Amino acid sequence: MAAKCPTLKPNYVVNLPSIKVKTITDKELINALINVESANNDNAYRSCEGAAGALQILCTMVRDVNRILRRQKSNQRYTYEDRWDRQKSIEMFNIYCNHYNLVTPEEKARCWNGGPRGLQKLSTKRYWEKVKKQLATQN
């Protein structure tokens, strides 16, 4: 006896999320990250973490970026004070993302927030949702 295929009710509705395709530039992503991280405040400081500047950079991030630069045989280095400088913070962000081969805005945002294994962390999914909301308000 052949199994019966289930039949769909005539008014069966499938709810699909709306699909919106938009290219996000690095500048747009960085602006969104700055708004999420510090509300666009270059002087922001979160004392419980030691996160400083527009991109809320930790001392460990500065050390990681300097380690990357040493491996690349670059003479360039960043100091903890450079976290307060927006342009230098953006440079550190770009060095970090390039080193870890982060390509998509989601990869960049989640790993910026959660480290090189950020894509594996649930907390960075919530962070990415905040960044996406910020990106939507920018456009």
Which residues does each predicted region cover?
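Short, functionally critical alpha-helical segments immediately adjacent to catalytic or ligand/cofactor-binding
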Residues: I24-N41, I57, F93, K108-P116
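Secreted/periplasmic proteins that engage bacterial cell-wall peptidoglycan
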Residues: A32-N75
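Extracellular/periplasmic catalytic domains that process cell-envelope and extracellular macromolecules
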Residues: K22-D26, C48, V103-P105
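Extracytoplasmic/secreted cell-surface and envelope-processing proteins
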Residues: D42-N43, L119-L122
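N-terminal secretory targeting signals
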Residues: M1-E28, A136-N139
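Alpha-helical segment that forms one wall of the substrate-binding/catalytic cleft
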Residues: C59-Q120, W128-Q138
